[in-house]
């Protein structure tokens, strides 16, 4: 599975082998990036992740797989999956963020991960502006 997340002025396209690995990774990100937001999730493998990274201009890379947030990267993600949002890029990612948060809350509401649930159960504060 592929994920697209944003944390402050940075974003990342990543891969997890399955939902369990993804949720584990998100718990880790929450420890070190307390304001990250999930922009989108899609089926995909390591090759898909590498292909998307190949389309991202080198000047947008910050460190490792983290990039400086730019709507060009969001458009690369949409183009790769052949997504043409009818209401615009911002509305698409806002709705996908809400859906991802709801899925996480449903999956973890009966577990001891209280802080994890508390974080994703709040109304989205997704900010897609460019600084």
Predicted regions located by residue number:
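Non-catalytic accessory segments flanking enzymatic or RNA/DNA-binding domains
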Residues: 1-130
């Amino acid at each position: 599975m592929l994920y697209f997340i944003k944390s402050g002025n940075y974003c990342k396209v990543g891969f997890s082998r399955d939902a369990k690995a993804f949720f584990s990774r998100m718990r880790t990100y929450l420890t070190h990036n307390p304001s990250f937001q999930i922009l989108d999730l899609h089926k995909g493998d390591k090759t898909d992740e590498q292909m998307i990274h190949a389309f991202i201009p080198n000047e947008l890379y910050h460190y490792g797989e983290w990039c400086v947030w730019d709507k060009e990267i969001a458009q690369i993600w949409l183009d790769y999956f052949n997504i043409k949002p009818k209401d615009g890029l911002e509305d698409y990612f806002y709705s996908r963020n809400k859906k991802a948060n709801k899925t996480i809350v449903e999956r973890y509401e009966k577990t001891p991960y209280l802080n994890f649930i508390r974080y994703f159960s709040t109304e989205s504060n997704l900010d897609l502006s460019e600084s």
